């Protein structure tokens, strides 16, 4: 540990928090000057100081003499991470680490809801799940919190291992493993190796491993680690009991139902969840099972989750327009999440379907094959209009000649704006770079 971390930690305790963005920082924040490929964070140090920063952590010696409130370090990012590690060691609370190819953020949100029945919980905000976001999240945990939930993302082998050294999880869950970020991981085996770094850390540090035994890859981990907790429920997708009592979950594609106890009559009533789809069914099961590990009754978890609304973050949002539904799932996309979304929307209602599907990025050598598979899948569906968007989706178009392909978002938008639809379910899904959520305003106009 650098000698200055202890001193910096004292200044952190006296501050109003940490900031890495001078545009949003608050008075008395400590400002860390982080640099990227196209910017030097040190250039914003004086601006941060003028806005009330109590201290600026810089790593460019040329700035060192400009103010006594500039703290020169070897590397600002390394110092941020070391400060987070030091803070984590001071926190005497369990931290749940969550990673996986799909469903990390939704499962994190559901688990926060379930754990809040009994505990004061801090959970990663938004998608702060990388080498910058994880230390910032750890530094937001304070003495009032009783449990932390830290989401961990990765696009190459070794990244989860590094994040574990910062967050030091005492319990961990991998939601699932699929073909995501293949370009960085190099292969599916690389994805498996990278995601399993969470379990490796827990195994070495006497942490509790929780395995989603619905996932065919994760099932292979059951014998690899000692005493894992398995997500409860059988393989049936019709009726999965989550305890020995009458409470349970039911999946009638695509809807999820809870058996919730009526506090007045004491009887169990079937209530429809605000989430839908097989993938969210598993996300709910994982959240309830982890909460049970922390001594929270499944019925109490279910009652909270049953009334929970998906936040407006472009993930599995359902927007009702007249007799139509927009299913907005445009935060990101990979082969498995794309397949899940298409199949769930196909069963969503009796409406005809409109698919607006964008590129799946970071697939490396398997990109052409996986985009072609999307085309094959959609070609088998009846009563559908399919709009493919982006360079890579041309391969999908070639496999579905009844579809339409647009090289750019603007081309797709201009074509779609001239159309009219009634009583349809519209899926909007693609990688983040396309920002397909922009189409919702136009969709609301043409769904008349």
Where are these regions (language model features)?
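Acidic, Mg2+-coordinating active-site environments of NTP-dependent enzymes
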Residues: 3, 62-66, 173-325, 347-351, ...
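N-terminal leader/targeting and accessory segments in enzymes
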Residues: 1-82, 86, 276, 346-350, ...
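ATP-dependent carboxylate/acyl-activation modules
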Residues: 98, 313-316, 433, 437-439
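Phosphate-binding loop of NTP-binding sites
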Residues: 4, 78-213, 217-227, 291, ...
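Active-site beta-alpha connecting loops in nucleotide-dependent enzymes
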Residues: 34-39, 310-312, 330-402, 431, ...
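Residue-level signal for inorganic ion chemistry
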Residues: 29, 48, 83, 98, ...
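Peripheral docking tails and interdomain loops at the edges
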Residues: 405, 423-441
């Amino acid at each position: 540990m650098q000698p200055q971390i202890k001193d910096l930690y004292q200044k952190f305790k006296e501050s109003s928090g940490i900031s890495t963005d001078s545009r949003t920082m608050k008075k008395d924040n400590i400002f860390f000057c982080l640099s990227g490929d196209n910017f030097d964070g040190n250039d914003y140090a004086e601006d941060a100081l003028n806005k009330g920063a109590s201290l600026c952590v810089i790593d460019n010696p040329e700035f060192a003499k400009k103010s006594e409130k500039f703290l020169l370090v070897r590397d600002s990012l390394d110092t941020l991470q070391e400060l987070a590690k030091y803070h984590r060691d001071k926190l005497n609370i369990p931290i749940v680490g969550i990673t996986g190819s799909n469903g990390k953020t939704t499962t994190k949100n559901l688990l926060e809801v379930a754990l809040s029945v009994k505990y004061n919980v801090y959970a990663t905000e938004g998608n702060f799940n990388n080498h910058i976001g994880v230390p910032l999240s750890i530094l937001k945990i304070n003495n009032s919190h009783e449990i932390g939930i830290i989401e961990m993302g990765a696009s190459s082998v070794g990244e989860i291992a590094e994040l574990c050294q910062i967050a030091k999880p005492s319990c961990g869950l991998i939601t699932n493993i699929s073909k995501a970020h293949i370009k960085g991981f190099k292969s599916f085996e690389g994805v498996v190796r990278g995601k399993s770094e969470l379990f490796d850390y827990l195994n070495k540090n006497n942490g509790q491993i929780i395995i989603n035994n619905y996932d065919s890859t994760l099932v292979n981990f059951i014998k690899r680690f000692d005493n894992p907790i398995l997500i409860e429920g059988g393989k049936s997708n019709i009726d999965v009991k989550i305890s020995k009592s009458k409470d349970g979950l039911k999946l009638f594609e695509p809807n999820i139902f809870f058996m919730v106890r009526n506090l007045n009559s004491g009887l169990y009533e079937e209530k429809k969840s605000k989430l839908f789809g097989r993938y969210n069914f598993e996300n709910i099961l994982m959240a309830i099972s982890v909460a049970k590990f922390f001594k929270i009754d499944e019925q109490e978890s279910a009652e909270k989750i049953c009334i929970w609304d998906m936040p407006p973050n472009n993930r599995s949002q359902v927007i009702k327009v007249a007799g139509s539904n927009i299913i907005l799932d445009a935060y990101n996309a990979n082969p498995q999440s794309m397949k899940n979304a298409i199949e769930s929307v196909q069963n969503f209602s009796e409406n005809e379907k409109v698919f607006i599907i964008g590129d799946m990025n970071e697939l490396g050598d398997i990109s052409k094959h996986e985009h072609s598979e999307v085309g094959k899948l959609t070609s088998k569906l009846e009563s559908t209009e399919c709009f493919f968007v982006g360079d890579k989706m041309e391969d999908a178009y070639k496999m579905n000649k009844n579809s339409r392909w647009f090289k750019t978002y603007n081309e797709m938008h201009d074509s779609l704006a001239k159309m009219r639809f009634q009583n349809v379910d519209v899926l909007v899904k693609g990688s983040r770079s396309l920002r397909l959520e922009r189409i919702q305003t136009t969709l609301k106009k043409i769904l008349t």
